[in-house]
UniProtKB/Swiss-Prot annotation:
UniProt gene name: prs
Taxonomic source organism: Leptospira interrogans serogroup Icterohaemorrhagiae serovar Lai (strain 56601)
Listed name of the protein: Ribose-phosphate pyrophosphokinase
Chain residues that bind Mg(2+) 1: H131
Keyword list, A-Z: ATP-binding, Cytoplasm, Kinase, Magnesium, Metal-binding, Nucleotide biosynthesis, Nucleotide-binding, Transferase
Residue positions binding ATP: D38, G39, E40, R97, Q98
Keyword Cytoplasm: yes
Uppermost EC category: transferase
Pfam families: Pribosyl_synth, Pribosyltran_N
Entry-linked SMART domains: Pribosyltran_N
Superkingdom, taxonomy of origin: Bacteria
Pathway: Metabolic intermediate biosynthesis; 5-phospho-alpha-D-ribose 1-diphosphate biosynthesis; 5-phospho-alpha-D-ribose 1-diphosphate from D-ribose 5-phosphate (route I): step 1/1
Length: 312
């Protein structure tokens, strides 16, 4: 990798940024990030970046508003420093779940965030497993939406799990589960959540054969973990031999870690798109690095090669 490229990291996930730089064979750019006494964010780029192709690594994870503002200010600082191009690497795109109007008088926040980022000025977005594919259309610049599935499939295949069933926790994720099942030679099951009538507990029906099988619950993220833990209990109740869980983004809000710990998961596998604090690291959680995938994409973008092969 030549000296015409620079990678800068915000505070949201410095570890993945450092791993990306290691795979690229470069040092991360020097940046001074701090807060003034009133909470305003201060940004100063310490390196000469004139004419460089710049990549900014920043997940808009919690605290989402701080990390989003930090990203925008880093972009502006670099643009004013006369870089040749800016590509933003957002491993986890916060506000992605608010991708449409679900009731009157609410914003489409995923689009608003896209507008905020784009108005500052950038050339490309590189992200992973957007909550909704249509978010790519909220930007006018190219968006490369990488997938955790190839990294996860490689890990699952090394475990050599017999009688494997890939389970979608809802009907919306069925296609994701089906596609992943082909990579690991697993069959498909879907959990159908129904509420028989008002004020009656939700019933989880399992569609597919899971009795005596090893199940992997597959989702794009784990937030409070309520859904996946209830789904795991339902699978075990229906005779599953074991239950694993795999998701790209470990948001892990509220009591998520406690819920996971008290549920009979054999293992919960996450990508490292969001930095997990030490207080939330438990034995059941397994983190897989997607830094090599992002580094490969960055290298291909830098050398004008196709990125599409990374989507397989």
């Amino acid at each position: 990798m030549n000296g015409d490229i620079a990678v800068f990291a915000g505070n949201s996930n410095k570890q993945i940024a450092e791993e990306i730089c290691t795979h690229l064979g470069i040092q991360s750019g020097k940046i001074n990030l701090k807060k003034f006494s009133d909470g305003e964010i201060s940004v100063k780029i310490e390196d000469n970046v004139r004419g460089k192709e710049v990549f900014i690594v920043q997940s808009t994870s919690a605290p989402a508003n701080d990390h989003l503002m930090e990203l925008i200010l880093i972009m502006d600082a670099l643009r004013r420093a006369s870089v040749s191009s800016i590509s933003v690497v957002i491993p986890y795109y916060g506000y992605g779940r608010q991708d449409r109007k679900v009731e009157p008088r609410v914003p489409i926040s995923a689009r608003v965030v896209a507008d905020l980022i784009e108005v500052v000025g950038l050339d490309r977005i590189l992200t992973m497993d957007l909550h909704a594919d249509q978010i790519q259309g909220f930007f006018r610049v190219p968006v490369d939406n990488l997938h955790f599935a190839p990294v996860l499939a490689e890990y699952v295949n090394t475990k050599k799990i017999d009688d494997l069933v890939i389970v979608s926790p809802d009907s919306g994720g069925a296609e994701r589960a089906r596609a992943f099942g082909k990579k690991v030679n697993g069959s498909l099951a879907i959990i159908d959540k129904r509420r028989p009538k008002a004020n009656v507990s939700e019933v989880m029906n399992v569609i597919g054969e899971i009795e005596g099988k090893n199940c992997i619950l597959l989702d794009d993220m784990i937030d409070t973990a309520g859904t996946i833990c209830k789904a795991a209990d339902a699978l075990l109740k229906h005779g599953a031999k074991s239950v694993y869980c795999a998701a790209t983004h470990g948001v892990l809000s509220g009591e998520a870690v406690d819920r996971i710990n008290s549920t009979q998961f054999s293992e919960v596998v996450l990508a490292n798109t969001i930095a997990i604090p030490e207080s939330k690291k438990i034995n059941k959680l397994k983190s897989l690095s997607v830094a090599p995938l992002f580094a490969n994409a960055i290298q291909r973008i830098h050398t004008n090669q196709s990125v599409s092969t990374l989507f397989d």
